[in-house]
Design a protein with these regions (language model features):
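N-terminal secretory targeting modules
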Residues: 1-71, 78-79, 83, 88, ...
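Compositionally biased, intrinsically disordered or flexible polar/acidic segments
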Residues: 77-78, 239
Length: 260
């Protein structure tokens, strides 16, 4: 893991230098290049993005008596859940969104304490792993992803937090309007998605956790994400989140009653 982290930092450093030195072209103004360089520098200084929710976390009060607070830990699929055009993130519920777009399980594990444990929820819903498969922070293995998920689950349980492990969503290849395809199934192998989901289901059963199965409700007859549930073959659209909402709510209630 140290080698992967070091490699990621080196790549980010090289990216910053390249962007800073690159000449402006027709589509890339100096301002655009500076913005991209600033983003890369921020990632270099804060690889797990601990700063993303730092201020928000300080404003979260201790849970009220009998409050059933839930934290959703995840990547862009969680991050985008409360976007204005997605139908709302469980309105009226004491649910906290701590998703960060593009993140892998390694990054989530580092920020698990400030973004989950310190908020003192009753339940955490973990949806993670698709960006690991895509290699967002470097090459990885199923064993490494599983290890990070186990570590998050163990940290939660050690702090009295019930755990819901959510399946990865299926993916599908998507053709943009200009004809350029987004080949999601190459970056995120359907076979590996199924293998990781199978492991999660078994791990949850063995350890008395709740397994939240989004996959079965969102996959088509060919094993891909249903076209009507996504606009890019990866992220849910409003219809996709409409499928996920009741499944998540049912899993949370089951965890509060029966999970550990």
């Amino acid at each position: 893991m140290f080698r992967l982290l070091s490699a990621s930092l080196v790549l980010l450093f090289l990216t910053i230098n390249a962007l800073a030195q690159a000449p402006a072209t027709g589509s890339d103004s100096c301002a655009e290049l500076k913005t991209r360089a600033d983003r890369a520098e921020t990632r270099l200084k804060d690889w797990p993005q601990l700063s993303r929710y730092h201020d928000d976390n300080t404003k979260v009060n201790p849970p009220a008596k009998n409050e059933q607070r839930v934290v959703f830990m995840g990547d862009s699929i969680t991050d985008g859940w409360d976007a204005p055009n997605m139908g709302g993130f469980f309105p009226g519920k004491p649910y906290v969104n701590r998703g960060i777009s593009g993140q892998t399980t390694s990054q989530m594990l580092i920020r698990f304490r400030p973004d989950v444990i310190d908020l003192k929820p009753k339940v955490v819903v973990i949806l993670a792993g698709t960006n690991d498969l895509a290699g967002n922070t470097g090459p990885t293995t199923l064993d490494a992803i599983q290890g990070n998920l186990i570590s998050m689950a163990e940290l939660a349980r050690a702090n009295g937090i019930r755990v819901v492990l959510a399946s990865l969503l299926p993916v599908s290849d998507y053709e943009m309007r200009d004809g350029k395809p987004i080949v999601q199934t190459v970056r995120r192998s359907p076979d590996k998605i199924i293998a990781l989901n199978t492991w999660m289901k078994n791990y949850a059963a063995t350890n008395h956790l709740i397994y939240l199965d989004y996959f079965s409700a969102m996959v088509d007859g060919k094993g891909f994400l249903k076209d009507e549930l996504s606009n890019d073959g990866l992220h849910p659209n409003a219809a996709g989140y409409a499928v996920m909402n009741p499944l998540a709510e049912a899993a949370i209630q089951s965890s509060l009653k029966h999970g550990k």
